[in-house]
């Protein structure tokens, strides 16, 4: 079986945990994967100097479909930046009139995916299609730096979700939301390759014997850690994890992994040590292991976008032997619902819960080791990427066997 992954980046965490990590395991099962980030064109004499649309209209330029022809399954993922983007003010739009009059230079990024989409929607297209997402892009908040990009793609995301023969995702809340577009939704939870979470670097001497508390993400995730202004009056909300750590600061060594260039000044007041953001997952895993965390924290703001996130922080902290404390939600499935509070991690939602949880972890090495050990044992058993690869293989097989089933779905709703 041949699987074509459309427009994916090798480095990023989403592409890795929902694709590249499994390539070698899939190969053992007879599944070949091809990840492409561009489409080639075949030009005939006379096409030189013409705009793409003009050359194609005159029959002088055609899409090289060899990758698509090779595939049994084509997988589309998350969203594609088909809008034009202003890198000066952050505006993203597909409105040609707005692009022409915009005062700054607009950068065109993916000009092919949306343009080709009618061909994938065609009744004559004979390949199975999977749409995969590990975020609920319809719940992204305006403060998120990717909001303009994602909002511009909502119509295409909807079309992709409706067109798919099978829709795959990482969590129940995403599956519930995207189920309005497609009857065939399968949850395939994230997994890890424990072999990459290792290091030969010794435990750093700075911080001495204090327990090392680690938080990772990107600088934007400081909103989850330190809180945020809300409402017309700008009342400060959240930030309970950061407040708890500040109150215990003299008893711990605080580490952040994921500083974006140029934002060091944002991180510096809160942390004793920091690592810059890296996109390559193997390098990130090494950095995480090299930080030698005793405690790994995973605060969240708690909105519907956050509710759709996966348990990846818990998995990765467990892999490097850190005791976990993460955001609890009042009701329903949430990122860390699978964590057994007091057994293989702690959950906290209120300011009191975060403080009491952090205090117990900081002051008890025995508790840290107990929680970390139980979490690692469970993660190695239940979240092995080799087992998850089999779930993906079954999804590919199902999609091929049911290709065209989307025609009986909700395409026109």
Language model regions located:
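N-terminal pre-catalytic "stem/leader" segment of glycosyltransferase-like enzymes
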Residues: 1-89, 93-95, 102
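Conserved catalytic-core segment of nucleotide-activated headgroup transferases in glycan assembly
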Residues: 10-25, 193-199, 204-291
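Membrane-proximal helix-turn-helix segments that form the acceptor-binding/catalytic region
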Residues: 63, 107-122, 137, 147-167, ...
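Carbohydrate-associated surface elements
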Residues: 173, 191
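Nucleotide-sugar-dependent
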Residues: 223-228, 232, 236, 282, ...
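Conserved acidic donor-binding segment of nucleotide-sugar-dependent glycosyltransferases
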Residues: 337-352, 360-366
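A short, well-ordered alpha-helix in the C-terminal region of glycosyltransferases
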Residues: 360, 367-382, 391-394
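C-terminal alpha-helical cap of glycosyltransferases
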Residues: 385-413
């Amino acid at each position: 079986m041949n699987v074509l992954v459309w427009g994916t980046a090798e480095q990023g965490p989403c592409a890795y945990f929902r694709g590249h990590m499994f390539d070698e395991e899939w190969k053992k099962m007879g599944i070949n994967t091809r990840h492409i980030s561009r489409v080639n064109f075949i030009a005939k004499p006379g096409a030189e100097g013409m705009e793409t649309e003009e050359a194609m209209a005159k029959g002088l330029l055609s899409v090289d479909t060899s990758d698509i022809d090779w595939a049994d399954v084509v997988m589309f993922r998350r969203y594609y930046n088909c809008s034009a983007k202003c890198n000066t003010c952050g505006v993203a739009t597909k409105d040609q009139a707005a692009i022409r009059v915009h005062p700054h230079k607009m950068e065109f990024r993916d000009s092919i995916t949306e343009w080709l989409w009618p061909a994938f929607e065609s009744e004559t297209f004979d390949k199975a299609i999977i749409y995969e997402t590990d975020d609920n892009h319809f719940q992204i908040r305006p403060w998120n730096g990717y909001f303009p990009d994602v909002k511009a793609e909502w119509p295409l995301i909807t079309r992709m979700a409706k067109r798919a023969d099978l829709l795959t995702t990482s969590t129940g809340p995403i599956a519930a939301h995207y189920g309005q577009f497609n009857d065939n939704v399968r949850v395939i939870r994230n997994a890890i390759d424990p072999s990459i979470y290792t290091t030969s670097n010794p435990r750093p001497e700075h911080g001495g014997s204090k327990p090392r508390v680690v938080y990772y993400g990107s600088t934007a995730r400081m909103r989850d850690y330190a809180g945020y202004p809300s409402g017309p009056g700008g009342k400060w909300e959240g930030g309970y994890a950061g407040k708890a750590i500040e109150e215990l600061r003299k008893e711990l060594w605080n580490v952040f992994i994921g500083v974006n260039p140029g934002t060091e000044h944002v991180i510096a007041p809160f942390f004793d040590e920091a690592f810059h953001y890296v996109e390559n997952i193997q390098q990130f895993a090494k950095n995480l292991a090299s930080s030698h965390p005793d405690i790994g924290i995973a605060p969240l703001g708690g909105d519907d976008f956050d509710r759709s996130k996966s348990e990846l922080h818990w998995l990765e902290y467990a892999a490097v032997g850190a005791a976990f404390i993460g955001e609890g939600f009042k009701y329903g499935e949430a990122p860390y619902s699978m964590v057994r509070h007091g057994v293989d991690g702690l959950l906290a939602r209120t300011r009191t819960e975060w403080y009491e949880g952090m205090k117990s972890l900081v002051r008890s090495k025995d508790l840290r080791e107990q929680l970390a050990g139980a979490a690692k044992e469970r993660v190695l058993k239940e979240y092995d990427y080799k087992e998850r690869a089999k779930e993906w293989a079954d999804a590919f097989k199902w999609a091929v066997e049911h290709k065209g089933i989307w025609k009986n779905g909700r395409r026109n709703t």
